[in-house]
Regions:
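N-terminal glycine/serine-rich phosphate-binding loop of ATP-dependent small-molecule kinases
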Residues: 1-67
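Beta-strand segments within the central parallel beta-sheet cores of soluble alpha/beta enzyme folds
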Residues: 2, 172-176, 231-240
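Conserved active-site and cofactor/substrate-binding residues in soluble primary-metabolism enzymes
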Residues: 29-33, 75, 79, 96-100, ...
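Short beta-strand-loop/turn "lid" adjacent to the catalytic site in phosphate-handling enzymes
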Residues: 42, 48-94, 115, 121-132
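General beta-strand structural signal in soluble alpha/beta enzymes
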Residues: 61, 92-96, 113-118, 174-176, ...
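Glycine-rich phosphate-binding loop of actin/hexokinase-like ATP-binding domains
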Residues: 122-225
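Adenine-nucleotide phosphate-binding core of ATP-dependent small-molecule kinases
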Residues: 235, 239-248, 252-285
């Protein structure tokens, strides 16, 4: 199942079990209410799959940012929660709700193990020559700035499946995660050695609403010469750029459909997207 748009009066909950599928739009103001709805479905006499919450042995939590602290899937305790809180500044839009989800799950499933899976963990094997930025080292060290990478769970799974399917011992694989967020990873013998996303989730490939690589001089031009605030530029690069900025559509299915109808902007956007992907494949090969 899935709960979307938490914090909205038009939140959505999707539940599926056996031959039952339920989709509802309702007011879900916070994670507590959202998980309560999920638990109610799980326990429901007609569509539920458990009789008691004590049947749940473990709850998995996707945590976007583990910094340099977490390099593996981790059983959550108070020490782990405290460390996740210290990483809020590295992912202010993601780690706080991830943390809230952990706290709420602990209240509903007090006897279950809570497990954290970090998006950044798989990329902790990237060597220093690939993760370090060429800005003053003192600044990097004092502020924990480096390439962290994201979508690690996806890249780890895909690379493991590819290695198993191909049956090779010494492997060099390029994995590509394509969706609204996009990234590419160079994987050598099962370990991440380079990745297109960096300190944040904006660099690299062209994404649904994120810009991918741009010349950072553009940011200074927007702020210093055109009067944009840093918040406005950040919002532009995160939510108004990428395929959406080029075409007005963020979904590739819509863009492909429009391109087939002769929409020149959509055709060019697809060419740009393919070129960027090929460019990184070439650099990782």
């Amino acid at each position: 199942g899935l709960v979307e748009r938490i914090g909205s009066k038009d939140a959505e909950i999707h539940y599926k079990s056996n031959h039952t599928k339920i989709d509802e739009v309702l007011d879900i103001p916070n994670h507590t209410v959202g998980l309560e709805k999920v638990v109610n479905f799980l326990l429901d006499e007609k569509v539920g799959v458990i009789k008691s919450t004590s049947e749940i042995e473990a709850v998995g939590h996707r945590v976007v940012h583990g910094g340099s602290t977490f390099s593996n899937t981790t059983v959550i305790n108070q020490v782990v929660k405290d460390k996740i809180k210290k990483l809020f500044s590295l992912a202010p839009q993601h780690n706080p709700p991830n943390y809230e989800g952990i706290v709420v799950a602990e209240s509903f499933f007090p006897n279950a193990k809570q497990i954290a899976v970090f998006d950044t963990a798989f990329h902790q094997t990237i060597p220093v020559e690939a993760y370090k930025y060429a800005i003053p080292t003192k600044f990097l060290v004092e502020n924990n700035i480096r390439l962290y990478g994201f979508h690690g769970t996806s890249h780890k799974y895909v690379s493991e499946q590819a290695i198993a399917h191909l049956g090779i011992e010494n492997s060099k694989i390029i994995t590509i995660h394509l969706g609204n967020g996009c990234s590419m990873t160079a994987v050598k013998n099962g370990k991440s050695i380079d990745h297109t996303l960096g300190f944040g989730p904006v660099t690299g490939l062209i994404m649904g609403t994120r810009s991918g690589d741009i010349d950072h001089a553009i940011i200074f031009h927007l702020v210093n010469n055109l009067g944009y605030s840093l918040d406005e530029v950040n919002n532009m690069l995160q939510k108004e750029s990428g395929m959406f900025g080029l075409t007005g559509y963020s979904d590739l299915r819509d863009i492909e459909s429009e391109a087939e109808k002769g929409n020149k902007e959509c055709q060019l956007a697809l060419q740009m997207n393919a070129y960027r992907i090929k460019k990184y494949i070439g650099s990782y090969a």
